[in-house]
């Protein structure tokens, strides 16, 4: 039997999150193709417990020690054979485990950074859903991919759409493909514009967390939903796209597409535009990366063209979306700026969801942190973590000076 028919063993970093649960959904549609080798989460014991009973992984790991002990006890009571581990070191070791064929890197935030890098350095097939790996460690990350010859496949719907719209030569050179030599003129990132694209600007101060997490098209976690509302999500994706596709500022274009049917596009020098379309369901890009270069069932409804009420495109308004402009400018400023902005944004969004700051304070805080932090060169992961720490501390102190909503 050909090796291509062997079941692929997958490690899911962030299995209890939105991308993780969608990945497990794809696996349930392909039980003969994929085997869950390890599940990794934060502290959601109950969901991890259910996932372990359903998928019977060899390993499960939680970042939180107390949560891991609770999980181990619950699994033992159910005669589960899954070995439970705890802490960052164990998670990094699972990400690089010799038995793993592929690693879904879907831990949200800076917490996913080291495990994702571990998978890359081990030369794994890495299905990249963690934005921070490229936002905070762009050059270091791409250099590690090149050195280890890891296979990097983008899961984010936009980057996956771009990936699918590229020629095979570019797909084989993620991180260092020469766009112009391959006849590519522009990478076009699309975004819905979030739930407030038509809300009057004077009402932005009154936006509540409940309103901000109600995304019109996609089912996402709270943090990413707020990032979509501010378009910081698109800003982070802009930074990622520049690294993933080796694109200059002139080779990038951001367009608001409210229907989220076209997930992104690639312009070619002959005037062609190749777009990837589909229903807004993360299982499509997840399945594409898992099966690449083949295709597999994802459990997604086919796109019904007769139900579409037209496709529209709008130029981004930076007054409405200052976070998008900040991200574009931060890339030009350097790695320290994108790292600081990302850290500040994590604190800002958490504070907004906790009703500690206003919606408009998110962009305000991000801008203040980037402008106040001293520029510095990033040479290694320790430098990244240092900037991240400084930016978080600065963010917390600035928030104290904000008047509460």
Swiss-Prot record:
SUPFAM superfamilies: 1-deoxy-D-xylulose-5-phosphate reductoisomerase, C-terminal domain (SSF69055), Glyceraldehyde-3-phosphate dehydrogenase-like, C-terminal domain (SSF55347), NAD(P)-binding Rossmann-fold domains (SSF51735)
Residues the entry annotates as binding Mn(2+): 156, 158, 237
One Pfam family, short name: DXP_reductoisom
Domain of life, source organism: Bacteria
Enzyme Commission no: 1.1.1.267
Binding site for 1-deoxy-D-xylulose 5-phosphate: 131, 157-158, 192, 215, 228, 233-234, 237
Record HAMAP family: DXP_reductoisom
Listed name of the protein: 1-deoxy-D-xylulose 5-phosphate reductoisomerase
Native source organism of the sequence: Pasteurella multocida (strain Pm70)
